[in-house]
Amino acid sequence: TEIQAQTIIISTGATAKYLGLPSEQRLRGGGVSACAVCDGFFYKGQEVAIVGGGDTAAEEATYLAKICSKVTILVRKEQMRASKVMQHRVTNTPNIDLKYNTEIDEVLGQQVVEGLRMKNNATGTIEEIPITGLFIAIGHKPNTDIFKSQIDMDDSGYIITHGKTTKTNLPGVFASGDVQDKDYRQAVTAAGTGCMAALDAERYLAGLE
């Protein structure tokens, strides 16, 4: 189908990356989430875990530590790749437990998350812990494949917008939401840039008259 228009707003979003475990996929919506800010309040006073070693994982862990009784961070490598500031914040939060060289073998539970079976990839040791929530913080993939070679993007595939606007490198083409935002990724910020894109598009169309 071909649709002709004088202006376009791209708002195809970004998709959270998951581990790909069958048990993880089965329990999405039953305790497995990719957004601590969205779903963290469901686990007030409970024990949860986060998978990831970057700034996002560290930020979500410190956020969850304020409302959950215990937060376990599972880092696949021997150290976090988060900034030194975030690493310091994590290690100085008493109810955060860091487990390095650790990967999930299976998410335990049938209808809801009840625990984790983990494997230390350095020693081969298997361990199980009880949790009620699992947060995946290993990044997002912007849904921009269809725009490759047409729209300017950064190395991660996020659309580059210019200055404080939603303008792209193509006149009349604007981008809003998670497709151009790798930092905030919230519904309210996406809605805000959507409003900005609509205003930018309106001004562009007015300039064509």
Residue spans for each PLM region:
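Redox-cofactor binding/interface segments in oxidoreductases and associated redox assembly factors
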Residues: 10-11, 50, 136-137
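Small-residue-rich anion-binding loops in enzyme active sites
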Residues: 1-12
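Glycine-rich Rossmann-fold phosphate-binding loop(s) that bind the pyrophosphate
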Residues: 52-54
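FAD-site-proximal beta/loop scaffold in flavoenzymes
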Residues: 15, 20, 25-42, 138-184, ...
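Generic hydrophobic/aromatic pocket-lining and core-packing "Φ" positions
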Residues: 61-62
